[in-house]
Each structure stands twice: as structure tokens, then as C-alpha cells.
């Protein structure tokens, strides 16, 4: 019997509900066979799902090239900018189902209940320009150790989209500068270990935020930011991010974040390539389960089982 002195306004739907967390080795098969009720997957994994289910789509991940600024060549901002100007996003997006990334913060992030990108603009990256790239390169060349132009290691997880884009980008770098890279496809564990230890020159990184805020993405490029794998930081962007976090007015905060984001992109230690969608799928026998694409948590508060 319900306790009248301790009741909720929301009715309790199921008579009983148990939650089990399964290992991720066979999670796609487990979802298809209804062993698990919900699953978060990327686009490639989505194609492997079968049966009836509902889908929530989130644009909360930016895939890009993280340049290790401890590497001799990449300690020079001019050379980094030369490389960034040879990324032709229109060409990269041809034949791809992913939207090209012209900024760091993805479209899922909101401020004032509106997409953050409405305040900051969608396009912050430099235009593809061989001429501009050569200007940066020729200016930086006297400072560069050209013996390092061969063998720079690009580490990445297995990813067909990123591999195809890398092939195009590396051809541009080879043609214009004679800069040759070696791609290493790694397991998730090995990639994470190499990224954390700095044992790489370039990493294909999936940038995500722990909360719904531009600052959660941009802090990865601050002096004391968690996940600052590039080693890049500047007093300008650090100050703008701190000011944005302190701003009482969210519209002012958005403008400050946008300036910080532009400053970081100008530093060219992270070169955005494309936005990667995540899909939260719910088995047909369940409803009202919600997913947070930022902190990767699932809300079962009002879950219903049929």
C-alpha cells in the first residue's frame, strides 16, 4: 500500500525494474537479441542493429587532428598554420555522410536553449589556400628542422572515414612541403595509452565534452585543462575562457567563448575535420529512457517497460 505521506507526483509505472550493466564485448549482439534494453553507438555500429527500436541522435563529438607541440616541427605555430590551410573540407566531405567541421565545438552544445553555433557562427577554420599555406611555410622554414620532414607518426583508432580523409590531407602535405607521415592504426587501449603519454606526432582525436558547455570542449586547449594532449595553450584563450565562465550574461559568455574558440583554431594545434554523430537506441519494449551525450550517462528515472 502506498504511503500517503511519502509519495511522488510521478506515478511508478513498472511493478519492478532491475538494471544490469553488461560488458561491451558483444553489446551489439546483446541489443539485437534483447539482452540489453538500450545502447549508444556510432554510425558504423548503427548499421549492425536489427529489429524495432527508437533512436535519439546527437551531434556532440568533433573529430580532428591533434598536433603534439612537443614535436620539433609542431612547436612552430607558423608551420602548424601552413598545414591547417591545406585541409580542403569541401573535398573531404564529398562522398561522406559526416558533416565537415569548421569549428571545435559541435552543434549539440547549447546556450540560452539555443545552439551555441548560432551565437558563434559555423565557420571558424581557415579557407583552403595553397597560396596562404606557402606564405606560412616560407616564413617558418628558416626555423624548421627539415630532417624531421619524413616519418611523423599519425596514431588513430580504426576508422574508415578518418582514414579516407587522412589520405587526401597527406597528399597535400607531401606535394607542397615534402612532409611525409606514417599512419598507425591502434586498438582503443593502445591509442589511449599513446595519446596520454605523448608518444605520437599527430593523433586523430575524438573531442567530446563532459557537460553541455563550450568550455567543456575548449578547456582541452588551456594551460591546466584536462585532456590537453597537444600541449598547446595561450594566455589569450585562457583568459577568454575564464571570462566566459564568469560572465553573468549568457549572451556575453557566448561571445567570449567564440573569441576563445577562434583563438585556439588560429593556434592550429587542433585541426577540426568532421562532426561525428552518436545514436542512442532503445529497444521497442522500453520507453522514456534518456541519454546524456556529454557525460555518457543514462537516465532511467521515468523508464517504462512494456
Predicted feature descriptions by range:
Residues 1-13, 168-177:
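Ligand-binding cleft/hinge of the Venus flytrap
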Residues 4-14, 50-57, 66-76, 111-132, ...:
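Short, solvent-exposed loop/beta-turn-alpha elements that line the ligand-binding surface or hinge
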Residues 5-48:
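Ligand-site clamp/hinge motif
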Residues 15, 25, 29, 33, ...:
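Solvent-exposed, polar/charged alpha-helical surfaces in well-ordered, non-transmembrane soluble domains
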Residues 29-30, 44-51, 189-223, 264:
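Pocket-flanking alpha-helical
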Residues 98-141, 161-163:
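Structural transition elements
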Residues 139-209:
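Ligand/substrate-recognition segments at binding pockets and active sites
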Amino acid at each position: 500500500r502506498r504511503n500517503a505521506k511519502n509519495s511522488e507526483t510521478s506515478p511508478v509505472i513498472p511493478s519492478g525494474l532491475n538494471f544490469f550493466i553488461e560488458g561491451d564485448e558483444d553489446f551489439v549482439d546483446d541489443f539485437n537479441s534483447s539482452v540489453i534494453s538500450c545502447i549508444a553507438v556510432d554510425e558504423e555500429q548503427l548499421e549492425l542493429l536489427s529489429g524495432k527500436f527508437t533512436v535519439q541522435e546527437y551531434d556532440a563529438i568533433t573529430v580532428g587532428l591533434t598536433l603534439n607541440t612537443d614535436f620539433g616541427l609542431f612547436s612552430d605555430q607558423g608551420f602548424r598554420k601552413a598545414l591547417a590551410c591545406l585541409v580542403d573540407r569541401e573535398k573531404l566531405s564529398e562522398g561522406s555522410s559526416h558533416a565537415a567541421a569548421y569549428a571545435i565545438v559541435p552543434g549539440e552544445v547549447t546556450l540560452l536553449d539555443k545552439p551555441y553555433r548560432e551565437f558563434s557562427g559555423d565557420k571558424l577554420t581557415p579557407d583552403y589556400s595553397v597560396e596562404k599555406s606557402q606564405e606560412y611555410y616560407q616564413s617558418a622554414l628558416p626555423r624548421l628542422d627539415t630532417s624531421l620532414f619524413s616519418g611523423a607518426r599519425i596514431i588513430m583508432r580504426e576508422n574508415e572515414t578518418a582514414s579516407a580523409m587522412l589520405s587526401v590531407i597527406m597528399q597535400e602535405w607531401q606535394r607542397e612541403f615534402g612532409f611525409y607521415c606514417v599512419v598507425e592504426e591502434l586498438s582503443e587501449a593502445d591509442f589511449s595509452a599513446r595519446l596520454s603519454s605523448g608518444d605520437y606526432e599527430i593523433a586523430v582525436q575524438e573531442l567530446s565534452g563532459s557537460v553541455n558547455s563550450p568550455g567543456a570542449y575548449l578547456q582541452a586547449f588551456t594551460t591546466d585543462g584536462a585532456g590537453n594532449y597537444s600541449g598547446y595553450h595561450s594566455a589569450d584563450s585562457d583568459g577568454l575562457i575564464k571570462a566566459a565562465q564568469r560572465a553573468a550574461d549568457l549572451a556575453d559568455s557566448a561571445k567570449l567563448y567564440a573569441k576563445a574558440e577562434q583563438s585556439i583554431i588560429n593556434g592550429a594545434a587542433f585541426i577540426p575535420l568532421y562532426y561525428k554523430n552518436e545514436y542512442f537506441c532503445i529497444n521497442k519494449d522500453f520507453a522514456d529512457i534518456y541519454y546524456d551525450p556529454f557525460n555518457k550517462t543514462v537516465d532511467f528515472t521515468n523508464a517504462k517497460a512494456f
